[in-house]
Amino acid sequence: MITIARTASRLALALSLAALPAAALAQDAKDAPKWDVAAPPGVKIREVPLNVEEGTWMNLDISPDGQTIAFDLLGDIYTMPISGGTPTRIGEGLPYETQPRFSPDGKRIAFTSDRGGGDNIWIMNRDGSDKRQLTNESFRLMNQPSWSPDGKYIVAKKHFTTQRSLGTGEVWLYHVSGGDGVLLVKRPSEAHQKELGEPIFAPDGKSIYFTRNTTPGPIFQYAQDSNNQVFAIERYELDSGKTEHVIGGEGGAVRPTPSPDGKKMAYVRREATQSRLYIRDLATGTDRKVFDALDMDSQETWAVTGVYPNMAWTPDSASVVVWAGGKLNRVDVATGKSSVIPFRVTDSRGVIDPPLPRVAVAPDSFETKMPRSATVSPDGKQVVFETLGKLWIKPMAGGDARRLTADEAAMEAYPSWSADGKRIAYVRWTDADLGEVRVIGATGGKSTVLATAGHYKRPVFSPDGKIVVFEKDAGGYLTSPRGSVEPGIYRVPSTGGTSVKITVNATRPQFGAANDRVFVMEGDAKESRLVSLDLNGEARRIHAKGELVNDYRVSPDGQYLAFRQNYQAFVVPLMPGSQEVNLSHKGGALPVTKASGDGADWIHWS
């Protein structure tokens, strides 16, 4: 038995867009307490004592006068004398704060913090006072700040994700007084998944060093061969805008750290399974290995915040201080001799205990957690949805759900009601026979096959119920490559017959009020378009477009348009004719009403 009452009903009600009074549609959580990373409302913070003489993945920097070292440890920032001792915590609390960098005058420290809700670049005084946010990214990740020699600018990495959740970086320049920043080193494409980061100013301020994954192609792969060149150090010239290769070769080169006198470059190279500290003479191109005992860098894996932690030169360009083996190690670059800078941190960390639900391993009945494709019947009395690979119908007023079919041999998905509420179109799937588009009565019984042996999605009835339109996709990745010829949007009589292709390179077919025009979605992950065509794929019109919009839903009367942007559902009037409108949840040419509270999936009109 499958208990589904609460989850399915809530999902259908939350995602059904009924008539349009703003108060009924938009239930924003305006009265909820504002979220504060440093003091989250409604949670209990427990202090855990800390007494350590070493740390993991510690970023560090040395003050311009050479007297003070700053470092991060478990998300807090400390300063202490360069000789070692008891550190002073200058950045603390629940926000995770890392990568401290002294300003050229030594009075301020730039750092990375999620204090504002996401990783951004912040600036504080040397003693930790007057923290202020420099960058204001709400979607991208910012990290790895570095000051210009005149103290007027900060260069940092901005991280971009892709459809795979992996991504790459760009190098951006920010004035310390604020602003949106200036792009210096652009990613090769929006689909690029190879890392770029670790920016740092040259001592003369004329160029910026950074690291780039130089392996062929745009797609990231795990377990790359670090014996060859995975990463290389490059230089961006501010005057010309040109980029040139600086250091690479076998074992790669990461974490570029130029000496204050501009004559040398400290960097990390891999030798077999061991990361080593090297020094490059920038005049002659000669490399010397000066320290063997680094921890493993992250060349083969993912390095959003850097391939190795920040290290720093002493002001006389004679020594490099680098984290390794849990310690802060001072390495004399002339002799290769190293010594540990001792420290002991005795304080605490605030932690919030996670929820600990009790989960029965194998109950006789259970509540499904992921009902999908919930669609309310035209009369508003029932909802059909898919869970555990089967289609179910449930009264909107509550009560038990029932199976729509008695088919135990196949998976079922993408249910859609006819306008009269008497039939449901859906997709049936088996690995052996592939997919079929079918129509069945809302009370169950025998189904009619409309399309066979293919990869199908989202069948939808025309308003008069005479036509079903659907997507035909291509397999070959996780599914069989069979049945993949001529993908596109098709139409077929709802009683059966020959399928006719309407268009290609489109998805999510649907109707508005008319039987002779089909709406589809075109575009890519960044920007999509709502387009309509006649049943022969002609008389094309663009109605709307929007960045990061991944779903459009035209109301049955053709008067309104629901769209999904940034995981939320919004509603706007649908302009008649071929008036192209730019959509944004922030508003614009048309009034926008938010229709969801805490996210929206499978939006549809009742």
Q: Where do the language-model regions lie?
A:
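Residue-level detector of Asp-centered blade-edge/turn motifs that repeat once per structural unit
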Residues: 64-65, 104-105, 149-150, 203-204, ...
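Conserved beta-strand position repeated across blades of beta-propeller domains
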Residues: 61, 101, 146, 200, ...
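Glycine/alanine-rich phosphate-binding loops at beta-alpha junctions
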Residues: 59, 63, 87
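Bacterial N-terminal signal peptides
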Residues: 10-20
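A short helix->beta-strand "capping" segment at the edge of beta-propeller domains
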Residues: 34-57, 352-371, 587-592
